[in-house]
Amino acid sequence: MTDLSEKVRAWGRRLVVGAAAAATLPGLIGIAGGAATANAFSRPGLPVEYLQVPSAGMGRDIKVQFQSGGNGSPAVYLLDGLRAQDDYNGWDINTPAFEWYYQSGLSVIMPVGGQSSFYADWYQPACGKAGCSTYKWETFLTSELPQYLASNKGVKSTGSAAVGISMSGSSAMILAVNHPNQFVYAGSLSALLDPSQGMGPSLIGLAMGDAGGYKADAMWGPSSDPAWQRNDPSLQIPALVGNNTRLWVYCGNGTPSELGGANMPAEFLENFVRSSNLKFQDAYNAAGGHNAVFNFNANGTHSWEYWGAQLNAMKPDLQSALGASSGGGG
């Protein structure tokens, strides 16, 4: 076979994969906001508070679910998926995360809302099917919220962790890149880790349109805008390595296990994002990174059962990295 024939065949494969993704991804990428799992919500009686935190940047109060790890405790920010709801954070809807982390010495913080936001400061108003609002989520998470928690709840404003799923996995890493003193730990579960590359911007735009009717251009401008590169974890590896950020990176392969998640959307999407995670690991190692856990299991779909299992497995690592004192809180 000639070199030209090989190139044509390779281009054809890319076009087929791209077309399939473009047709399928809009309804899939936000699956993280779907129906609750059988293990949804923590048991009653836990000291979970529902805070209304003022945000000058967004011009409204933001609901935050909070469980204290004790005075002076480090914080774990659990970030939601693309279809984040306005009533509860997806981690609470779909897992007993508060129960898992009760008396762990870690304050658990779940911001509520932010559908399709990527937890970013958007260029323009976020206009969707429900109307327009201001999205300045990075400002909220890195300035307004930590100041409020330090002043009112005794939570450390530095040495924290950000853990995200799907949409917010890349957000967790970018928060650590941009705010290394606040976020010394970033957990990314089943995220697309090269969003600026290839068809990434187009597919993200389609998915955001499906999840609330939002436009990616309002977030970071056209795909040629440098904001896309600034928010691409695969291009920010030198900063993550240089800051010695502790990373926990997970992605399944689209094959369900006994945990569940056996449905076509969850299987397709997990398999779709896996390659970006494998490439990220290779680039991280090549850059001299040595402070990461990579879990690329021989099973796992794009669903809460697997993300919950990872959050459970992550707890001792979080406690060690953040210097938490077990038994704190409650």
Swiss-Prot record:
It is found in: Secreted. GO terms for molecular function: diacylglycerol O-acyltransferase activity; trehalose O-mycolyltransferase activity. GO terms for cellular component: extracellular region. It catalyses: 2 alpha,alpha'-trehalose 6-mycolate = alpha,alpha'-trehalose 6,6'-bismycolate + alpha,alpha-trehalose; an acyl-CoA + a 1,2-diacyl-sn-glycerol = a triacyl-sn-glycerol + CoA. Substrate binds at residues 82-83, 166, 194, 272-275, 279, 302-304. It holds the Pfam family Esterase. The antigen 85 proteins (FbpA, FbpB, FbpC) are responsible for the high affinity of mycobacteria for fibronectin, a large adhesive glycoprotein, which facilitates the attachment of M.tuberculosis to murine alveolar macrophages (AMs). They also help to maintain the integrity of the cell wall by catalyzing the transfer of mycolic acids to cell wall arabinogalactan and through the synthesis of alpha,alpha-trehalose dimycolate (TDM, cord factor). This is Diacylglycerol acyltransferase/mycolyltransferase Ag85B. The lineage of its organism: Bacteria, Bacillati, Actinomycetota, Actinomycetes, Mycobacteriales.
